[in-house]
Every structure is written in C-alpha cells, then in structure tokens.
Amino acid sequence: MTSPVLQTVALACERDLRLLFDNLELRLASGDMVQISGPNGSGKTSLLRLLAGLMQPTDGQVLLNGKPLGEQRSELARNLLWIGHAAGIKDLLTPEENLTWLCALHQPAERDAIWQALAAVGLRGFEDVPCHSLSAGQQRRVALARLYLDSPPLWILDEPFTALDKQGVAQLEEHLAGHCERGGLVVLTTHHTLSRMPAGYRDIDLGNWAV
C-alpha cells in the first residue's frame, strides 16, 4: 500500500457548539484526487482547512508524511497550495502584482513564468489591469493561475470552479487530473459534476461521519 501524504486519525471537528464529524479516518496518497462531498453544514470547508493546517481539530490529528501537521509548518508551506472559496487576491493590485506577492510568500516566481501562468488561464492582456476592474470569473482565474506556476505537490481547493465559464471549467478539470497523474495530490470540494477524473479519484461523503 502506498504511504499516505496526508492522513487523519480519529479526527473530530466542532463548530458553533455542534459536532460536524467525528472519528474521521482518511489516507490520501500521491496520485489521488479526493472530492469531499456532503450536505450543507456537514463540514466540507472545515475539513479542508484542517487538512491545510488553518484550523485546529476538536480531537484527533492530521499527519503529513506520517508526522503531526503542527510539528512541521515549514514543510507544510513548501508542500501545500491552498485556494479557498474566495479568490483571495488584492483588488488594488494587478494580476501580475498579486501573483508576485502570493508567490513571494513561498516560492518566488519570475515575471515570464507569471505571464505564462496568466496566459494559461485566459488572462493574456490583463496582466497590468487592476483586479477591481476584472469580473468575478477573471478574479478567480488570477487565483487559479498559481496552479500553473512551479507549484507544490499538494493542492487543497475549496470550490475551485466557482465563477468559471464552460471553457475554464474544462481546462481546470484537465489540469487537476494531469497534476494527479504526474504524482500530485488534489483535495477539493465542488458542486460541479466532474467529467475528467484520474484513476486515483475518490469521493468522500462527510455524511458518513456525521454525528
């Protein structure tokens, strides 16, 4: 059996005095695409944030390469790319400036690489346009352009297809599947029905761990 990149051990999450899930056991390995599903309020986004080290569990733990997540923050920063439900960009900056700033936090990127990433998500010609002038879909593409840079192996994505048109959805599906087929790991939530899934695709319904 392939050693897991991410693993949860008896994981529990409580929000607003309500236990969302309990005793959650997951093993996520290289090559996997794992879709977290479940009804509204089941804790999908909370689970992603726990896996990304952005929240502390009520009980249990998350392991990265066999070691507790909290003990290896620098390792997590090198290995993780997190994109939340919001675009997470600064409106007053241009797409190029946003990506330069975001990449500088972890792995600085050259200008040519940033422009190529923006072109890959259909934003050629918008590199120097302030993001407040872009549509919601274009702003989402700025955030997703990080996936086309020299990115880490673990991607955790909350509703990545939000505000994308049909072409953008198809392109992103292909890119996510390709990342997994090259040995990466993708964990995501989405209300979109995926049409391009790698061999390592799994759907995990949090309703099975509801309390």
UniProtKB/Swiss-Prot annotation:
Give GO cellular component annotations, separated by semicolons: plasma membrane
What the record says about family reads: Belongs to the ABC transporter superfamily. CcmA exporter (TC 3.A.1.107) family.
How does the record say this protein sits in the membrane? Peripheral membrane protein
GO molecular function list: ABC-type heme transporter activity; ATP binding; ATP hydrolysis activity
Question: Which PANTHER family does the entry mention?
Answer: ABC TRANSPORTER I FAMILY MEMBER 1 (PTHR43499:SF1)
Enzyme's top EC category? translocase
Q: Does the keyword Nucleotide-binding apply?
A: yes
**Identification of the protein by name:** Cytochrome c biogenesis ATP-binding export protein CcmA
Gene3D superfamilies linked = P-loop containing nucleotide triphosphate hydrolases
